[in-house]
Amino acid sequence: MIGRIAGILLEKNPPHLLVDCNGVGYEIDVPMSTFYNLPQTGERVVLLTQQIVREDAHLLYGFLTPQERTTFRELLKITGIGARMALAVLSGMSVQELAQAVTMQDAARLTRLPGIGKKTAERLLLELKGKLGADLGALAGAASASDHATDILNALLALGYSEKEGLAAIKNVPAGTGVSEGIKLALKALSKA
């Protein structure tokens, strides 16, 4: 299983890439969210990958963030969703937008994606509910409360608090608060709980 590729980006043709790793060129398909954030050709790139082995092909899919790869893997577990469809979902909306759509059970938002009809959207909502990680949907909502929600959450997790406790505490942090002040406010909220 190939889990990570680091090398020189040789070609970029949406959604395909060619990455040279010590003289071996790997063809990798990426969602557009990853494609738009890639360096220029000739520069070094590091991608997290998902290898899919079929009877007729060995395919690599690449992602810049662990959240994208995890979401891709969750999408593949859904009946009727293959790698191409999962890539289309991640190309059409961010992981946070998908998590919000699942949390709000917003099928209309998903049907705007190419290849996703009403029944597929409903199946996605049903099967992804609670599987994208509590932090994705809740953190998307908490991000409006604090610009540094991820950093604050990571600090709270490092201090031994659960993800659920951390997310609840972040909701008490006002927008525009710095990381250190946000951690103090979150800890204060946790001490009262």
Swiss-Prot record:
Chain spans, region Domain II: 65-139
Region (Domain III): 144-193
Chain spans, region Flexible linker: 139-143
Higher taxonomy: Bacteria, Pseudomonadati, Pseudomonadota, Betaproteobacteria, Burkholderiales
Full protein name: Holliday junction branch migration complex subunit RuvA
Disulfide-bond pairs as recorded: none
Cellular localization per UniProt: Cytoplasm
Keyword DNA-binding: yes
Ranges where the record places region Domain I: 1-64
Keywords, in A-Z order: Cytoplasm, DNA damage, DNA recombination, DNA repair, DNA-binding
Gene giving rise to this polypeptide: ruvA
Domain notes: Has three domains with a flexible linker between the domains II and III and assumes an 'L' shape. Domain III is highly mobile and contacts RuvB.
